[in-house]
Amino acid sequence: MRRELGGAVCNVGRSLARLDASIPIQAVGWVGEDEAGDYLLAELRRFPSIDVSHVQRGGVTSFSDVMTVRATGERTFFTYKGADNRLTPEDFPTENIPLLHVGYALLLDQLDAPDARYGTQMARALAQAQARGTRTVLDVVSETGDRYQTIVPHALKYADDLCVNENEAGRIAGLSLREGSVLRAE
């Protein structure tokens, strides 16, 4: 067993910082007031281009235990929704930023919550960013539930780009993209 950072903020933020240290990155989210939150912030601060001033503290840091089948590479995630489940549209920066990458739809309950005007709180956050001229990216998490078609389309309306795997794409569209191990083509 080993400890690794993960999630949209850590994965996308650190990858961009490694690719081009001149890109200014604002990490936005919540981490716990615990050792795991301290560790996460310390790791992000190792990158001078990552600004963590929009990361708030409270509760217990969220985490996932990931089980991987070596023979097939299949992964199963067991997630504890902790501090990052507090994230709301009000937590996002209001200044004009060139790109907003929001992840993950179907994992952040506050952002998946209903909004009278936009459908979901995540859709509201993306719409507000677009209104300021920000390019928006929606990242979706894999799950086995039936919420893909009821939650994701609201936010999808306000996403310039979409990060999904084939399973997520099929679930959002209501299509089965595979027949056994064969990818369907129509």
Place the predicted regions along the sequence by residue:
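Ribokinase/PfkB-type carbohydrate-kinase core domain
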Residues: 30, 38-57, 62-186
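Glycine-rich phosphate/adenosyl-contacting loop at the front of the ribokinase-like
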Residues: 1-26, 35-45
